[in-house]
Amino acid sequence: VELTPRQQGVLALQAVLPILHLGLEWYRGFHEVIIIPEPVTRRQEVQDEFGLVSEFEEENAGESWPQGPLVLAWSELQQDGDWDGFNLVIHELAHKLDMLGGDADGAPPLPRGMDPQQWTRALQGAFDEMNDQLTREEVTEIDPYAASHAAEFFAVCSESFFTDPLRLRAVYPAVYDQFARFYGQDPAARYPATRLLAGDPGAQG
């Protein structure tokens, strides 16, 4: 996908938002962002508690690996930019921050002065609460994909922190407080919303 200078700039602005007060060194370990036209479909295998293996196809709009590039689907990026709790760039870069601590597990290295126990207590409590809601077949305020894994909970809540901060603060105030300390920002204070990425039809696949 070939992007215009404006589109490149807008994506760069979104990418720098999470590390605005952390510093560029928090993006160490990767040096490339690959933009593909559409999400990638991969065949996955999952083993249940009885040892039975089943296959399914999973569509990935973005992917990130330790020391590897960031892969983002342009068709999905064009839908981002509103303050609606969804942002692919922030989601995948949150995984990159998470991986600085080793495996992606929702426990990135914390800035000096933060209490790891408070971090774990806040995120684990909210993660368990969301899973309990889904068990009761209730509608969640945050994207239920967050309940699939601790790493996804961190990434999805990071999306919400920056693009729907009032909702995250209302639903999971302890998580919002920890994120405000981690990212060194209070996005709820900069409401009202502003468009981060206006869909520009000028891109070429």
Task: Please tell me what each predicted stretch does.
Residues 81-98:
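Short alpha-helix carrying the canonical HExxH Zn2+-binding catalytic motif
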Residues 13-21, 38-83, 100-205:
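Metalloprotease/metallohydrolase-associated module, dominated by Zn2+-dependent proteases
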Residues 29-35, 71, 97-99:
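A structural signal for short, well-ordered beta-strand segments and their strand-loop junctions
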Residues 1-42:
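Extended cationic-aromatic binding surfaces that line active-site or macromolecule-binding grooves
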